[in-house]
Amino acid sequence: MNRFLFPRLNSSIIRLCYRSTSTNFGLTNRDRKRFYKKVSVVESSQIPTKYEILLDQHKLKTPLGNIITIENEFLALALAQEWNQQYKKIDLSSMHLYSLINTFIDNPLKFTKNQLIEKLMHFLDWDTLLYRSDQPEELRQLQIKSWDPILLYINKEFHTNFQSTYDLHIKDLINKNDRYIIEKYFLNFDQSSLNIILFIVEQLKSILLTICLLKQYRSIENIATLSRLETEFQISHWSNVEYYHDYEMMDICSKISAAYLIFYCLNNNITRTILTNETN
């Protein structure tokens, strides 16, 4: 059984976070003392093509008691590193990878693939980029400058005709053909990926920005800023709470980073061999 051990002080993978209320060890969202000395990744004895995480000799499980098995080696290493970065205390609220992986393994709400797509399409009807503010004029111009290139990219990439409006009461802003094209795009992904996509959409309140992220059209930081354009505008003009603003941006970026890392690993076969070859 191959085993990859992690030194306690290794911090090569960024700490990514999300809320989790409990684990198979009975932990709650409160900090608990670290009870394990080392974290390791092992090949699954049941499924050799998958990997498991060991805390000392204990297999890591989900809140519902399912052993966490991961097909992608790099994702398993990242999850192990997240546990390894808990030093004296275990801060579950900071462990976004663990929480997101729990969600698509346990599927606590029992969503089917079609139900996940239906929930995603609901966000399209009220996409942040499509419904805009016409006042003040400075904000209106900022939206045009910042969001119009995104719409142009989506329309060119998918041969759609998405258009924005300043009328919040307009009905049927999105035509049936455009809805069908976006829905067909999501049908390409499996249920685990759709769970992750839904999480990103819920953070950004925008399917169109999420698609740009999935296609690597813009950086995570830029996507997060675009999703909060009106908030950023208000803060820049009237807010003096600089540190709270920085915390909010770091929080949303860390959550989206964790989700995108999982999405990318689920849809790409990344191994330590590939990473080693690319860095040499």
Feature map (PLM): residue ranges:
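Internal, conserved structured core segments that host functional sites
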Residues: 114-182
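An N-terminal structural lobe/cap that precedes and organizes the functional/catalytic core
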Residues: 22-110
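N-terminal mitochondrial targeting presequence
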Residues: 1-31, 280
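Conserved active-site and cofactor/substrate-binding residues in soluble primary-metabolism enzymes
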Residues: 71-74, 78, 145, 203, ...
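An internal, amphipathic alpha-helical element
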Residues: 174-240
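Long hydrophobic alpha-helical segments typical of transmembrane helices together
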Residues: 224-280
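Short cationic amphipathic helices and targeting signals
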Residues: 66-70, 128-131, 138, 209-210
